[in-house]
């Protein structure tokens, strides 16, 4: 089974906690603070592995959580940074943020990497907070939380050639004849619901990958039937082989099929029409095929080169493969997203934290709820088991303008204020 889209959860490792410690050595009566910083949490890094062909492995493991950094230690020793969590993906994987739809990475070449979830920085130890007025601070930070998100992985088939055409025109049969692929073949529509890949050898030391793509019907660009699944897989192909049934047994007109398929390709993505297209008249071994072919040629004109074949008897297949191989050699790849520096195999990760620093809402019971990236991060990095840390957090809230905003919303002494799952009283 070919899995081409899957949703997974990734979380960068939390930073290690900073430590509160003091030098306790003989002959050093006033050693001062010596708590080390926590280590950085591990990133979740996606790496392209050319040996992979599907996203099947992600059906069995959908959660990837990187290790947190080591906690700070005494004697000013910093915690160790955790090793990044490496997640291998097949070439052609597009990674999207499930919430925003933003494309985080388009991974094509072997060894290409992208950081999908950043690990948090380590919390600072108490030696970082020493000042002239507070030479022995009882204060240290918790590690910064690692970023977490749900992402959608989409696999684009990295085939050189894509077979397109209406269902049951003989695409699966053709692929099985010219390669070692063994797609399921039957005489009903939508037999092929996932792409089948096959390596084709032309006999003159040339080879290419051909994909028998899911059947296409009118309205595919709008998502009708299997449309979007089909069109996602054809975006990366360099040559399109358009297979048309000349037998007439399905009751459809070959020319109307030809026009409909091309309209769908044009509607979905204009760049699809830039690819060279080879028109294949299949099922020429059937009784009315020759007559239908002549009528088809009259309608399309002389500018369209047509290859009459029979996938069953292999008539004309050899000439078709030579033509396709020639086109591949002269046709460049069509990347979906332009890359500024093709020599760089890494993807720059940008995490936008701009926006509202905090937001205050009020629940039906009168509780004030404070939310926002900055305040929640500050809250998580505060060690509430130490009084100095609590006082520092209160100062940080005042500095962000939260106290003033609460008063403006009508908060009074004793009112309940909630951040994440924690509650405390407002003191004016």
UniProtKB/Swiss-Prot annotation:
Which residues are GTP-binding? Answer: 165-172, 190-194, 212-215, 282-285, 310-312
**Record domain OCT: where:** 350-428
Report the cofactors. Mg(2+)
> Which GO terms of type biological process are on file?
ribosome biogenesis
- Pfam families, per database record: DUF1967, GTP1_OBG, MMR_HSR1
Keywords, alphabetical: Cytoplasm, GTP-binding, Hydrolase, Magnesium, Metal-binding, Nucleotide-binding
Record bears the keyword Coiled coil: no
- Domain of life, per the record? Bacteria
Name any one GO molecular function.
Answer: GTP binding
Query: Which major enzyme category is it?
Result: hydrolase
All copies of domain OBG-type G, residue ranges: 159-329
Q: Which residues form the Obg domain?
A: 1-158
InterPro entries reported in the protein's UniProt record? G_OBG (IPR031167), GTP-bd (IPR006073), GTP-bd_Obg/CgtA (IPR014100), GTP-bd_prot_GTP1/OBG_C_sf (IPR036346), GTP1-OBG_CS (IPR006074), GTP1_OBG_dom (IPR006169), GTP1_OBG_dom_sf (IPR036726), OBG_GTPase (IPR045086)
Q: How does it assemble?
A: Monomer.
As for family, the record states: Belongs to the TRAFAC class OBG-HflX-like GTPase superfamily. OBG GTPase family.
Q: What is this protein called?
A: GTPase Obg
The source organism is Bacillus cereus (strain AH187)
The gene designation is obg
């Amino acid at each position: 089974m070919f899995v081409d889209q899957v949703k997974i959860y990734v979380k960068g490792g939390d930073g290690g906690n900073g430590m509160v410690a003091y030098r306790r050595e003989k002959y050093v009566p006033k050693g001062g603070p010596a708590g080390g910083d926590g280590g950085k949490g591990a990133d979740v890094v996606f790496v392209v592995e050319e040996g992979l062909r599907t996203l099947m492995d992600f059906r069995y493991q959908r959660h990837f959580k990187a290790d947190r950094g080591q906690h700070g230690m005494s004697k000013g020793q910093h915690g160790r940074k955790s090793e990044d969590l490496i997640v291998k993906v097949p070439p052609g994987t597009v990674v999207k943020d499930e919430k925003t739809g933003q494309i985080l990475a388009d991974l094509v070449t072997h060894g290409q990497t992208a950081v999908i979830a950043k690990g948090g920085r380590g919390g600072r130890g108490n030696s970082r907070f020493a000042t002239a007025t507070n030479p022995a601070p009882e204060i240290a930070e918790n590690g910064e939380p690692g970023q977490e998100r749900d992402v959608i992985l989409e696999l684009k088939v990295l085939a050189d050639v894509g077979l397109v055409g209406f269902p049951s025109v003989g695409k699966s049969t053709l692929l099985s004849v010219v390669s070692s692929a063994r797609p399921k073949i039957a005489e009903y529509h939508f037999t092929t619901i996932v792409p089948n890949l096959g390596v084709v050898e032309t006999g003159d030391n040339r080879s290419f990958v051909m994909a028998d793509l899911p059947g296409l019907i009118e309205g595919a660009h709008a998502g009708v039937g299997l449309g979007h699944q089909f069109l996602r897989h054809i975006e990366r192909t360099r040559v399109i082989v358009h297979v048309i049934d000349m037998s007439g047994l399905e009751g459809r007109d070959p020319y109307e099929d030809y026009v409909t398929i091309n309209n769908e390709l044009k509607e979905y993505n204009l760049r699809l029409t830039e690819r060279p297209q080879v028109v294949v008249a299949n099922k020429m071994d059937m009784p009315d095929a020759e007559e239908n072919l002549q009528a088809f040629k009259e309608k399309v004109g002389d500018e369209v080169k047509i290859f009459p074949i029979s996938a069953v008897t292999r008539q004309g297949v050899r000439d078709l493969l030579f033509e396709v191989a020639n086109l591949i050699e002269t046709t460049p790849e069509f990347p979906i997203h332009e890359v500024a520096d093709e020599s760089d195999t890494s993807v720059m990760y940008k995490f936008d934290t701009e926006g509202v620093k905090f937001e205050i809402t009020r629940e039906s019971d009168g509780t004030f709820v404070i939310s926002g990236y900055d305040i929640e991060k500050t809250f998580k990095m505060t060690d509430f088991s130490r009084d100095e840390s609590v006082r520092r957090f209160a100062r940080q809230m005042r500095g962000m303008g939260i106290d003033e905003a609460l008063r403006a919303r009508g908060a009074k002494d004793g009112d309940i204020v909630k951040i994440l799952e924690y509650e405390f009283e407002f003191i004016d």
